């Protein structure tokens, strides 16, 4: 019995040390996946550059509304997403990822959205694309080694 208890205690304390930094566990993640026609990709990129500047100047850096991470990535949509050598479809995929301390950060973000000068253009652009929006997902698993 004591051996089992020791094993459980050892696993409880040692496994996280091999799993990378888990600083985002339990935080709130907003993710938009946008599939845009190639003809709209440059417009999208410009809008995301404006969005990043607005985010930097308006969002909290500490407290329950803190924006902890922000990134936008893009790639050509592929006919076979797991084969990087497959033919492109002619669309571009953008992935917007924002991590907040809590749901309060997402609520604050959406309350501020109308103040972004390019919001009407962004909304119009989104309506021309195929969009999947995940507004406030809880992070339950996280491995982060970036910069280490």
Q: Which sequence ranges carry the predicted segments?
A:
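Sec-dependent N-terminal signal peptides
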Residues: 5-14
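Boundary at the C-terminal end of the N-terminal hydrophobic targeting segment
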Residues: 19-21
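Active-site-flanking beta-strand signature of metal-NTP-handling nucleotidyl enzymes
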Residues: 27-35, 95-97
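Structural beta->alpha junctions
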Residues: 35-40, 100-101
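Short amphipathic alpha-helices within nucleic acid-binding modules
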Residues: 42, 102-112
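A common structural junction motif
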Residues: 52-56, 114-120
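Short, glycine- and small/hydrophobic-rich beta-strand elements in well-ordered beta-sheets
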Residues: 56-95
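Alpha-helical transmembrane segments and their immediate juxtamembrane flanks
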Residues: 132-148
């Amino acid at each position: 019995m004591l051996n089992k208890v020791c094993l459980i205690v050892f696993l409880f304390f040692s496994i996280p040390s091999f799993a990378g930094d888990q600083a985002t566990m339990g935080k709130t993640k907003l993710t938009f996946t946008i599939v845009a026609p190639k003809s709209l990709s440059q417009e999208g990129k410009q809008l995301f550059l404006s969005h990043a500047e607005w985010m930097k100047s308006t969002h909290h850096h500490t407290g329950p509304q803190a924006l902890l991470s922000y990134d936008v990535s893009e790639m050509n949509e592929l006919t076979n997403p797991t084969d990087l050598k497959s033919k492109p479809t002619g669309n571009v995929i953008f992935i917007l990822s924002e991590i907040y301390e809590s749901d309060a950060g997402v609520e604050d973000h959406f309350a501020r959205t109308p103040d972004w000068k390019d919001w009407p253009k962004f909304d119009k652009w989104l309506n021309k694309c195929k969009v999947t929006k995940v507004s406030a997902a809880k992070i339950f698993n996280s491995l982060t080694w970036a910069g280490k």
